[in-house]
């Protein structure tokens, strides 16, 4: 735990869960910046699933529940995980002293975009990015905001876009986590804000 905690903010931390990751292993996964899990046999849990009251179908430890709880960036087949992890590597620096990732591109940074201000958040970020490619994180969590890495003129940029809905606290947590990562690795951030404010309710107030 100590070594991984000390590495936080110095190098990007990745966790990949292919089978059972319980107790201490689940805590280690939660310390990572990016977490992935195989969606058939993968399980992520602090306590044995049968120790949780009402958890008859082992739902809490499965990929869908863990994605919705914000503990995973992506779940899929083994082949899909490999593709997704390689995509993450292509956008992100190796450490916090790495120069901003740049690559040669032919896409025009100054191209016109029709209907941009009426686009859904995810589509707007994709439209801005070189060749329309983005790498989205925590997609199933805090759905009032989209957090993704994109490229502008070959340089990796962090993108945050709100969806036009009132913000729930989960979306705020998601954006804050993303911003802290970008700050640690000197990644510039582009923000597209379209929201009427914050949801009303006890959870948001507390």
Q: Regions from the language model: what does each represent?
A:
Residues 1-5, 14-16, 148-206:
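Cleft-lining beta-strand/loop regions that shape enzyme active-site pockets
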Residues 1-3, 38-41, 113-117, 121-127, ...:
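Generic detector of short, locally flexible boundary/turn motifs and exposed helical patches
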Residues 24, 31-33, 137-139, 144-146, ...:
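Short, well-ordered helical secondary-structure segments
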Residues 68, 79-169, 176:
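Intrinsically disordered, low-complexity segments enriched in small/flexible residues
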Residues 1-97, 195-206:
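Conserved catalytic cores of soluble enzyme domains
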